[in-house]
Amino acid sequence: MALLEICCYSMECALTAQQNGADRVELCAAPKEGGLTPSLGVLKSVRQRVTIPVHPIIRPRGGDFCYSDGEFAAILEDVRTVRELGFPGLVTGVLDVDGNVDMPRMEKIMAAAGPLAVTFHRAFDMCANPLNTLNNLAEFGVARVLTSGQKSDALQGLSKIMELIAHGDAPIIMAGAGVRAENLHHFLDAGVLEVHSSAGAWQASPMRYRNQGLSMSSDAHADEYSRYVVDGAAVAEMKGIIERHQAK
């Protein structure tokens, strides 16, 4: 049966995902940046309360995946922290200036991760040659690749995802970006073994007092009074679709 991973930005969302049938959580901060490394406090609280597998993302900033020496040092430190806290896996990725896997740095990440299952995130979708990249990641023992098939959403990239699946058994190809209940059957019919979804929506802040003329974001038009949360009903619906597909 296909595995359902839910992207979560808080402990509350991780618990919601777990309670509604998620098989695994990708734990992130900063949804507007596409997911950054969670704080130590969030990591510890999730580790204590969530019982399904949780894979934190290790990404020090938004933007591209070619990092300075200081940023890469932080990545390695965060990998070690996640390992010490007892998480079963993590999500990360590094590229060089030419859009290839940064091989020396990826080797260091894998050494720091040790027995943890490593997912190479959507840095894969920014690489220059996906098949060569997949071969490189297989050599390192990367467990899975999260990809939209190098398109803006995974449904548009489904043909590339199928090509990657046909390329070999490892790493596992996990489809993500725009995967929802209404299009999930396309991925299941294509033989995708793991799917990744945020399964959520922006929720209004409970604050009654609002200073509407002020923003804490560099984007002056950002909505400071909303937050992204997992929708338990959406998770349950996706899980039900997967179970019914398996029963066919």
Swiss-Prot record:
GO terms for cellular component: cytoplasm. Belongs to the CutC family. This is PF03932 family protein CutC. Homodimer. PANTHER family: COPPER HOMEOSTASIS PROTEIN CUTC, COPPER HOMEOSTASIS PROTEIN CUTC HOMOLOG. It is found in: Cytoplasm. It comes from Escherichia coli O17:K52:H18 (strain UMN026 / ExPEC). GO terms for molecular function: copper ion binding. Keywords: Cytoplasm.
